[in-house]
């Protein structure tokens, strides 16, 4: 699967916008972001790999329960939060190669 930076950004927004520290986000609650659940799971796994989220992530089940963003997740989201910055960042990425690591995206933004 290919990494979808827009989906990653949208998942981070969804986690940030969850209203309660006691309520975790599940795959079902994220399903409005994309109809392909396998793609959603894959991107949650990537966010977990990057250390941007805290939760129960079981790739074998598969099961997810995202409790919150990490400090690093907040920092990344703050860097790409503004829509005009995000649009410019994606434009720059398109000129370079079309894809990049999350750290490179943060640096460009």
Where on the chain are the PLM-derived regions?
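Basic amphipathic alpha-helical segments that dock to polyanions
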Residues: 39-51
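A short, conserved structural fragment
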Residues: 48-60
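Membrane-inserting effector segments that mediate pore formation, membrane fusion
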Residues: 85-109
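Generic structural signal for hydrophobic core residues of well-folded globular domains
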Residues: 15-18, 47, 77-80
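Short amphipathic alpha-helical interface segments
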Residues: 2-31
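Short, amphipathic alpha-helical interaction segments positioned at domain boundaries
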Residues: 65-93
């Amino acid at each position: 699967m290919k990494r979808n930076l827009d989906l990653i950004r949208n998942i981070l927004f969804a986690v940030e916008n969850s209203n309660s520290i006691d309520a975790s986000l599940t795959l079902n609650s994220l399903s409005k972001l994309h109809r392909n659940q396998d793609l959603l799971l894959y991107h949650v796994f990537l966010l977990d790999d990057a250390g941007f989220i805290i939760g129960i992530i079981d790739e074998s089940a598969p099961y997810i329960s995202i409790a919150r963003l990490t400090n690093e997740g907040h920092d990344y989201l703050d860097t790409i939060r503004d829509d005009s910055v995000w649009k410019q960042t994606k434009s720059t990425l398109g000129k370079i190669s079309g894809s990049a690591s999350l750290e490179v995206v943060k640096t460009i933004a």
